[in-house]
């Protein structure tokens, strides 16, 4: 089932390659959307795709960055179908 995933990651998640890794994983899993750093030190992801692919994105990011992630605030929504690819927003 196609879903939208909105996540805010907090912890020491900036300056460690988090966004680039998210972009690579999302591309491999066929997930669209974006990832960006926030001014308060968090990283935000808004992604759409098959639910299993989105869960895979969460699991792989958690596996890669578990020592840096303090908290992941996750919300599942209905997709807006407005993304063609996954990119880093600046």
Give the location of each predicted region:
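Intrinsically disordered, low-complexity, mixed-charge
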Residues: 1-90
